[in-house]
Swiss-Prot record:
Pfam families listed in its UniProt record: EFG_C, GTP_EFTU, GTP_EFTU_D2, LepA_C
Protein name as catalogued: Elongation factor 4
Gene Ontology MF annotations: GTP binding; GTPase activity; guanosine tetraphosphate binding; ribosome binding; translation elongation factor activity
Membrane topology: Peripheral membrane protein
Ligand binding (GTP): D14, H15, G16, K17, S18, T19, N131, K132, I133, D134
PROSITE patterns xref list: G_TR_1, G_TR_2
Keywords of this entry: Cell inner membrane, Cell membrane, GTP-binding, Hydrolase, Membrane, Nucleotide-binding, Protein biosynthesis
Protein's UniProt keywords contain Protein biosynthesis: yes
Organism: Dechloromonas aromatica (strain RCB)
Compartmental location: Cell inner membrane
Purpose of the protein: Required for accurate and efficient protein synthesis under certain stress conditions. May act as a fidelity factor of the translation reaction, by catalyzing a one-codon backward translocation of tRNAs on improperly translocated ribosomes. Back-translocation proceeds from a post-translocation (POST) complex to a pre-translocation (PRE) complex, thus giving elongation factor G a second chance to translocate the tRNAs correctly. Binds to ribosomes in a GTP-dependent manner.
Amino acid sequence: MDHIRNFSIIAHIDHGKSTLADRIIHLCGGLSDREMEAQVLDSMDIERERGITIKAQTAALSYKARDGKVYNLNLIDTPGHVDFSYEVSRSLSACEGALLVVDASQGVEAQTVANCYTALELDVEVVPVLNKIDLPSADPENARQEIEDVIGIDASEAVLASAKTGLGVEDILEAVVARIPPPKGNPDAPLKALIIDSWFDNYVGVVMLVRVVDGVIKPKDKLLFMATEAEQLCEQVGVFAPKSEKRDMLRAGEVGFVISGIKELKAAKVGDTITTMDRKATEALPGFKEIKPQVFAGLYPVESNQYDSLRESLEKLKLNDASLQYEPEVSQALGFGFRCGFLGLLHMEIVQERLEREFDQDLITTAPTVVYQVVMRDGSIIEVENPAKLPDVTKMEEVREPIITATIFVPQDYLGNVITLCNQKRGNQVDMHYHGRQVKLVYEMPMAEVVMDFFDKLKSCSKGYASLDYDFKEYRAADVVKLDILINSEKVDALSLIVHRANAQYRGRELASKMRELIPRQMYDVAIQAAIGSHIISRENVKAMRKDVLAKCYGGDISRKKKLLEKQKAGKKRMKQVGSVEIPQEAFLAVLRVDN
């Protein structure tokens, strides 16, 4: 046990976590030179293309230290995006230590702080690493100072390294061996193992990534899952180094995989404790808090006969992504589909992209919304995540919207722009601190404003330097209304929005004029209206295309022409009564692009 070290790598987006993981794997001989490629642990195509990590991945390595002993290192690479912060906390709870990677040219950023606090809360030893010191713009002294000022941990012994060139990677491993404590645990006690992650493999069923806390786990053991009380027979165990290798057993303190022929991911819940049937553990390990979706959107197949295949795709995707939630819903405009819950906008984009790529789905997505709490006249509280389901105004006492606490780090030069943006988004400033070149802003903001396009705007008004981290705070009463779009006086439920009353007029006008550009011309006039309740706030018309029925009358009597025009008029009137307007996919996306 003394020779085991479990550690994760935590950092802000693009500070070089995955590159550092590559270097460490290479140095420990986990892969030969031929198999080495950039971002070894990022296994999905999307992760590679976007250059981000989505799923935490592990590697078990052996390292011969300078003191001549051989240590077993279990490395877990974690994501940096705020949407995937729960992956970070899961990885950290399986470790005794963490490498806090900070880009020496950028300094401390929002996720650095958030992830580091998560680590400190879980009582994990944090080893600061200053990466990218080969860059001409690197300023290690300043970065050191920022770590001490902002986070408050001692950075005097921070390791200087460059993951790109491989400089200082050995020093990092020496620091891991020297400063991170070995795992505590008793190999002779009854088995207790924590499920850190689980995913579906087409050949063997569900693969569980576990951290063994006490006892040993070996094939042919009868396993008991403590939360679901399911029983399974263990088929094989092993480790990822980073390729999977079978082992005879996993002992206390080790991180590895367990396969037990489960076909349902529900049985292997992340955060559950595994024990054996013959020697049961008395109490389960503290798991993780269930992650709640923050953003909801409707996903509909373009062809209505694709509904079943979309359902199967979502089921398969959920096997790999425990935080995705979905339930069937029906829309008058779009037919049958699903209401899906996501952790944030990036998560939503990635799920959509994976459905389109890996499962060949053609999708229509509705605008993302957050969950509102509605207090009814009779005192009951309901949660509404779909604008079309908002009850009638006469039955509601008040609507409460979710408020978040946003922590923003921004260089001083862009401070004004960021404050202006936060005020436009109905933000309330709570705190502001200067740390060297950086300013730390704390704002309370409505989640609905952050969901739409806040992140993109924050990046563009600070030339990409500002960084954001947010946490849910509470529900607060808000003056919000439901904005409906009517096309030929028919409500289109998929275009409904819940907006703040102050923005409603403007959003209504913008949306109506956007729709006018996107809806193709018909043989009759199409009226597009934006309404709050029964009050119409804006109207646009799509002019009819007109066939020239008088083309064949050269000269001749006026009554002849009148007869033809009347006939055309009657035809158009009849057409307008029965005709329905096709709404193109772009129109649904237009809702997303209306600026506040």
